[in-house]
Amino acid sequence: MTNLRKTHPLMKIINSSFIDLPAPSNISSWWNFGSLLGVCLIVQILTGLFLAMHYTSDTMTAFSSVTHICRDVNYGWLIRYLHANGASMFFICLFLHVGRGLYYGSYMFLETWNIGVLLLFAVMATAFMGYVLPWGQMSFWGATVITNLLSAIPYIGSDLVEWIWGGFSVDKATLTRFFAFHFILPFIIAALAGVHLLFLHETGSNNPSGLCSDADKIPFHPYYTIKDILGVLLLILVLTSLVLFSPDLLGDPDNYTPANPLNTPPHIKPEXYFLFAYAILRSIPNKLGGVLALVLSILVLAFIPFLHTSKQRSMMFRPFSQCLFWILVADLLTLTWIGGQPVEHPFIIIGQLASILYFLLILVLMPITSLFENNLLKW
């Protein structure tokens, strides 16, 4: 009798994706982040569902409903902080996952990579709308500033902003629709993640060497299931430590003040994981230019496969490209720091230089260095 997991229509799909999947024998812990992102998404959907049971998307009661969740609902404080800090963990895993893809040349799987870029945009949109929901000062002003950027679009800009707002300012209509979108988007993200996996399993995983691993495959279960469980346990350890010891470490104190349209906070800044993009936005004095740079800072990832000039896929054996990669990482950390600083000297010039370096590295220096390394192979 054939095993049920190989014959049952539904089990067959699960089996070919998570049990009998042929995987390269040499993939490192950098390949754990895909499964960690899946765990993060499940945690976010579950905690979000329980929060939505008690939350009210009305400007008069939104702030107090969040307070009610933290004070009166059984373990409401835990659910709320798991959701808020879970988002931070989600983005940390996302950035490490993308970084892994850049370093080891996983972007050569075009369909998988492009769906990944789309997923990144979807997750960023979801996180932005979620940040608006508690209706604190930073929620309100963050929503006002970021939605206002669309007014930079020529001709249709101002109409578009008012259409998104549902009025002449960020108000009840905006909050209600943001809640609706924030609720539906994670399910769209889950569907996209399924497509992401579908495309990945068409080609099989990449590996650190960047070479074809067809000659040396091992089954996903038990080898990588055990490895993934270790990653999940570490993720849970970090998340619970953050939630139970310093839940407000990554938050903004201004968001504990109810939204007040008549009082602007001294420094409007987004959540920790958006600061690098915010720094790029602020470093360009022109509004439209800033918006384009903001979008391009993520969209540039979609161009990377076409800028691959190296004869080798991975950076494992390319020391010069490795140097540039780590300079890019340092540059992103610099941008993150700048995004949280006030707009004054010397932060303005540092932000501008870091923004120029970011695009220069990806679009110019890395492809040229790859060509140089190709020539070194001839020696």
Curated annotation (Swiss-Prot):
The record, for SUPFAM superfamilies, names: a domain/subunit of cytochrome bc1 complex (Ubiquinol-cytochrome c reductase) (SSF81648), Transmembrane di-heme cytochromes (SSF81342)
Quote the Pfam families the UniProt record gives.
Cytochrom_B_C, Cytochrome_B
Instruction: Write out the annotated subcellular location.
Output: Mitochondrion inner membrane
Give me the segments passing through the membrane. 33-53, 77-98, 113-133, 178-198, 226-246, 288-308, 320-340, 347-367
Cofactor: record remark:
Binds 2 heme b groups non-covalently.
Q: Which UniProt keywords apply?
A: Electron transport, Heme, Iron, Membrane, Metal-binding, Mitochondrion, Mitochondrion inner membrane, Respiratory chain, Transmembrane, Transmembrane helix, Transport, Ubiquinone
Q: Name one GO molecular function term.
A: metal ion binding
Where does the UniProt entry say this protein principally localizes? mitochondrion
Assembly and partners are described as: The cytochrome bc1 complex contains 11 subunits: 3 respiratory subunits (MT-CYB, CYC1 and UQCRFS1), 2 core proteins (UQCRC1 and UQCRC2) and 6 low-molecular weight proteins (UQCRH/QCR6, UQCRB/QCR7, UQCRQ/QCR8, UQCR10/QCR9, UQCR11/QCR10 and a cleavage product of UQCRFS1). This cytochrome bc1 complex then forms a dimer.
Miscellaneous comment in the UniProt entry for this protein = Heme 1 (or BL or b562) is low-potential and absorbs at about 562 nm, and heme 2 (or BH or b566) is high-potential and absorbs at about 566 nm.
Protein name, please?
Cytochrome b
